[in-house]
């Protein structure tokens, strides 16, 4: 739905959409809608979306179409970065079907000109091959569908494994819980995957 000069995507039953709908009703009619009127409207919208609306798969942090990758900055203006084989550009307005979880955190606005080698100073990699594997994981993490590589960071205690994991995660999918405890079962794993693009344990 359109709001403050941009578009946002939220489930119909979410608090964000309900607040927007109530505000629109007040703008149009000058009256606050009652609880039953709001509920009736939500049911109609659900039915129309299910039976009449075009179906589009939602994107969580990343998505792709027409040979381009889109990365949600997760900021208040819902901006995203469009990445093609030759360039990237910041999109202030777009129709990308991004959705968000409450744990997702914003990425900074990208800046041109820096080399990937800048990342070396933040990662304690012993070999050139290890650094290249980390970069390969970052690039693969921008894709919206798998298969994905699994990056296993090994080292003795105190060698910066957790710090490296946080840094790599923060570059593609910052989260309120950058490193999670190992899931106890498949259900925990599915819940974690549903709310995040990248999983770090």
Tell me the role of every PLM-derived stretch.
Residues 3-4, 84-195:
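P-loop NTPase catalytic core of nucleic-acid-dependent motor ATPases
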Residues 4-129:
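Segments of Walker-type
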Residues 199-200:
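Hydrophobic positions in the central parallel beta-sheet of the AAA+
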């Amino acid at each position: 739905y359109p709001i403050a000069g941009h578009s946002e995507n939220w489930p119909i039953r979410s608090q964000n959409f309900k607040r927007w709908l109530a505000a629109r009703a007040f703008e149009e009619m000058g009256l606050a809608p009652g609880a039953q009127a709001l509920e009736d409207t939500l049911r109609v919208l659900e039915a129309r979306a299910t039976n009449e609306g075009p179906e589009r798969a939602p994107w969580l942090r990343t998505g792709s179409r027409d040979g381009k990758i889109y990365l949600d900055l997760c900021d208040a203006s819902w901006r995203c970065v469009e990445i093609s084989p030759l360039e990237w550009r910041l999109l202030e307005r777009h129709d990308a079907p991004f959705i968000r979880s409450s744990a997702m955190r914003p990425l900074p606005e990208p800046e041109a000109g820096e080399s990937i080698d800048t990342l070396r100073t933040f990662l304690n990699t012993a070999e050139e091959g290890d650094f290249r594997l980390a970069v390969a994981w970052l690039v693969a993490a921008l894709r919206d569908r798998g298969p994905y590589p699994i990056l296993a960071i090994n080292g003795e205690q105190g060698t910066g494994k957790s710090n490296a994991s946080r840094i790599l995660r923060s570059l593609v999918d910052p989260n309120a819980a950058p490193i999670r405890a190992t899931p106890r079962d498949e259900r925990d794993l599915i819940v974690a995957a549903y709310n995040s693009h990248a999983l770090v344990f």
